[in-house]
Amino acid sequence: VIKHTNMMFYNFSITLKTCDMDLILCDMPIWKHVYHTLHSLDQWYINPEVYTEPDFHEPNLNSLDDYDNQKVLSREMLIDYFETIKEKITEYLNSLCDEDLYEKPDGCEYNRLSLILGQFRHFHCHMGNINATTIYNTNKWPKVLGMYWLDKIDDCEDINDLYE
């Protein structure tokens, strides 16, 4: 779980660097899709019943059904939020043992493994949508590291390695 979460984080760091935040997808700018993806990860990966919104959050800011065009999140804000989530989830995962994955967090109807797998599904779905806009508009394929890279994530840090 830890290695796959780290791979997910690395792949999304590439997405954050390659996407056009102002591009519109389904009537919403990409930055809003990015925030929706990150907000869901932040809320649901650990325990949705014990969750505090980020300081900059406003009602419906994470919604892909509601866009009032009042607040815009910059790439820098989203990267900072992403880094905060990464730290929180990494600390959380390092505190767990395998048996903990089958237990339900306080007040939650799902066990920890279900929450994590649900976020893998949701996160990768949205990351794919965001990456598809980059592919369509630039004719470049953002690098997505797979199983081969599980033990080699640190080998792809150069900006020139952001695309396949």
Segments and roles (model prediction):
Residues H4, M8-T15, S40, I85-K88, ...:
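Amphipathic, well-ordered alpha-helical segments in soluble domains
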Residues I2, N6, D27, V34, ...:
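Generic structural concept
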Residues D65-E103, L113-H124:
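Acidic/histidine-rich alpha-helical segments that form the ligand environment
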